[in-house]
Amino acid sequence: MEYGFTGLNNSRQSAVDQERMSIVASHMYEQYNNYQNANLIANGIFDSIYDNMKILTDYFRQTFSARGIPSDDIYCLQDDVTKSLLMSIMWHKIGFTMIFNDKPQVLENSVKSQRTIYSRIVATKGDCIKAINENPDSLTEKIRNMEVASLYVPAQRSMPCELRTIHLINEIHPVSISIENANKEFLLKVIEYVCGGGYVHWQSTYL
């Protein structure tokens, strides 16, 4: 007796089974194509973010130097291994990474069709390159705790990107941004969010 899909092309295999698997194959083929297209568009946005990051880094270096403040801690870099960017503005570290784009993924609760495949660029408060290298076994959890916003990039250029920012009260606020403006708007908003705030002294509990 044969079990499973042994002899799938055998004449005994029903046409119904083949039709069902054909639907699955077509679905996966469509997802794969959309995944490739979304990543292609996202890679272009990612490269443009780095180009704008270098321009802004020069601006901040000049601005602080003109005020007599050392600018050694103002720089940016790209890491191809982790698919990440890092921008340092004095004591603030801002990261962008595409490391999670390893398979086709839809966007939950998207205003668009649930079938739409998106690529994702995650923005972090803190050095995402260091976090990725030091936490290979708990990568998703670590980056999730550092995330301040994510840009979701669709597979079709006619569709807008969706920018989701995480506010201090942990509410997610989605905003639609055109693909043409996504790189600059995403970078500026993240810098405003991270550097426009600050840090709080930790406090001990005294008895």
Task: Label every PLM stretch briefly.
Residues 1-22:
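Charged, low-complexity intrinsically disordered tails and linkers
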Residues 4-6, 30, 97, 101:
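Compositionally biased, low-structure terminal segments
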Residues 82-207:
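Intrinsic disorder/low-complexity polar-acidic segments
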Residues 2-5, 66, 93, 196:
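Intrinsically disordered, low-complexity segments enriched in small/polar residues
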Residues 70-86:
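Beta-rich nucleic-acid/ligand-interaction surfaces
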Residues 15-75:
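Contiguous, amphipathic alpha-helical segments that mediate oligomerization or scaffolding
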